[in-house]
Amino acid sequence: MTISAQRRPGSPNFQSGETIMKVSRYLIGAGLAALIVAIDGAEALAQQLDTVTVTAQRREQAVTDVPIAITVLEGQTLNELSIATLDDLQLTVPNFQVTQTGIGTQMFIRGVGTGNDPAFEQSVAQFIDGVSYGRAQLIRAPFFDLERVEVLRGPQSVLFGKNTVAGALSLITAAPTRETTGYVTATWMPEFGDRQVDAAVSGPLSEQLMGRLAVRYYETDGFVSNPNKGRDEPSREQFAIRGSLLFEPNDRFDATLKLEHNRFDSRGREIEVVRDVNTQTLPNGVPLTFANALTGAGLPGAITNSEFNFTRDADSDEFADNTLFNATLTANYDLGFGTLTSVTGYLDYSRDELADLDFTNYFILTGLLSEDYDQFTQEVRVVSRQDQRLRWIAGGFYQSSTLTNNDITGFGPDITNLGFAPLANVGLERRYKTDSTAFALFGELTYDLTDRLRLIGGLRWTTEDKDATRQIAATTNPLGFDAPLVTDPVVLATIQAGLGVELNNPGGGSGHDLSQSRSESRLTPSVTVEFDATDDVMIFASYKEGFKGGGFDVRGNRTAFFEFADETVRTYEAGLRSDLMAGRAQFNATAYFSQYSNLQISQFDGTIGFNVGNAGKTEISGFDIDGRIALTNELSLAAGVSYLDFEYTDFRRGNCAFQETPDGDIVDGVQLCDYTGRRGRFTPEWTGFARLSYDRPVTDTIDFSSVLNVAYTGSHNIHDNLDPLGNVDGYTMVDLRAGFGTERWEVALLARNLLDEKVLTFAANVPFASSVGANTQYAVPLRPRVVGVQASLRF
């Protein structure tokens, strides 16, 4: 695997769209031909596929009746593939990427996602049991004991809300049952010390009351070596517990209460310096890399490794401690003409984190973070009966939330060697708080124009108010809050002139004590036409609008970048859903074209801050194809492929990559770079997967089962500022699970990343390296190959 922008000698140019199209057409054609041959010989032996039921449109439907580009993974599939996080999930969902960054987590669908700023709400909204989880940090939470996962591509604003401009991720947890059931599953992967236990028990507590209790414990030793600390990183520990009660006094009313607590902690991070490019040579002939510059400045061994080899330099005692509590109450009442549903949700999380931000073996720069978030939501909706010509949904939604984010950029004593002696042992403390209140009314009508032709129209009105404050001040403690303010004018001048930070210290000049409010209201419509071409094939076309609210920047250092605008999208889709071969196969396809305005962007400024803004215009287009087929009673295949074309059509405020000539707009005295005509990061042209499942009896009581999953991601850029050196080659991830078992027990072997691909998912520049003329970059790798064993007991 290479992260160079240059081709390897003799290799095809897989960054050429024309070549990719030719290769892909050949592969798709060959695959279809092989599939047809297999179908022809196995059709008589194959059984029907199970019906997959989803709630993507706030009502139960077969997945083939939903006019949305959707990928569904049921609980059994999640268990078979050992999917426990969103990092795992992306390997089975085309056009879906998840990555850790230096200071957060990002999620993208069709190349659209959310940047690093904690103030951003997610363009790919995450829902658990119908409750929005709108903060980036919540992506890191483990998910467990699930009934299914639904990944919806494209805006879903009418029924899911304002922050679904790219799509929605809906997780549905397993519900209490009337029969007593349970399981215990233990997984061990010795390569990196992975140990995981999942358990659940469910059953009746009385005639009208059922309960379920599920737990997850996980720990790992890490997969990136840190010689300075003498350990592997990141070591992780997770514990989660969920209790559910289902009350059904009669056949017209039910209520489900779910309480969940999560704790997920880590020590160290999976970040390493992967390149230290010299652009000059010193008079003595030594290449001017950042490592050599640090050595010359009296910091020998600051960077001992600058290649991608799962080895990192860091001296800080890094940690990340996260706790999450959520409560959800869902009640349904049969009104006769429809069903009244109330979903009440409360969640609270806290995060404390210390990160090494200089990526060296010295104390130059650290980041200390303390974040708290609480949210209350209430949705009430009525869904009409579905056995009538005119069907409808109507409802209202309310949300209130508070985000508090305090952080310190700490300058250690070793920054003196870089020529910033006044900053030694100084902390740059930033305090941020935002309060948000949102209210929405929504409705959707479905009318049967004929027995085969349907018209669906939806509309959502949303209003939101936000109030935010931010202060930045220099203090006398680089690793602690509430320290005395710096009064030395030399220190203040160094921070403002050398780092471009506007301060609130006495004599600091700018008075960086911001307080602003914003209010916005939006109508987001959708129109869909469905036509049943046959009893088994449905064709549809749709137009949808969506928006994500604006807000106020957390991590910026200058007052001019405090507020950012809302993000909007218009999307056109057309596709088909089909059941084929008497229920033994399904084929789905969706083509799309989207126009985004004001995509919210956060980019590293090269020193210690991030600039937040909006990309003027962006266009994306492509298609998503997926299907399933039961080849025989024992063998089944699921596969999908997605193509994405992404272009900034008007974006003149991008951060410049290393030594890139500024040619964009001038903002607050700084000229930026013109990204117009470029692809965004995390936008591979081609992604796809194929999953082969094979199950057969070995004896009268013992069965053999296996799952092989192959996922492909095409070449794309992963750099925060679109540096060409951040281009990564396409890669293929192969996972395998095979085991023996009965209805009561199972033992299986697991292999993740079987081909041992070396993959980087995010890259950015090391702070201060550009000041000496070095293009030094750090990156986040995926784990290399792991093999393990899993044992389960069921009752």
PLM features: residue spans?
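Periplasmic-side early beta-strands and strand-to-turn transitions of outer-membrane beta-barrels
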Residues: 170, 178-179, 187, 200-300, ...
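Outer-membrane beta-barrel translocator/receptor signature
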Residues: 122-123, 135, 144-153, 158-241, ...
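Acidic, small-polar-rich N-terminal luminal/periplasmic segments of exported/outer-membrane proteins
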Residues: 17, 47-179, 574
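Structural signature of Gram-negative outer-membrane beta-barrels, strongest in the C-terminal barrel
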Residues: 246-250, 382-385, 397, 434-594, ...
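C-terminal beta-signal and adjacent terminal beta-strands/loops
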Residues: 711-719, 740-795
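Outer-membrane beta-barrel proteins
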Residues: 187-196, 206, 218-250, 254, ...
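Gram-negative outer-membrane beta-barrel transporters
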Residues: 393, 451, 455, 588, ...
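Membrane-embedded beta-barrel scaffold of Gram-negative outer-membrane proteins
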Residues: 328-335, 339-355, 532-548, 563-630, ...
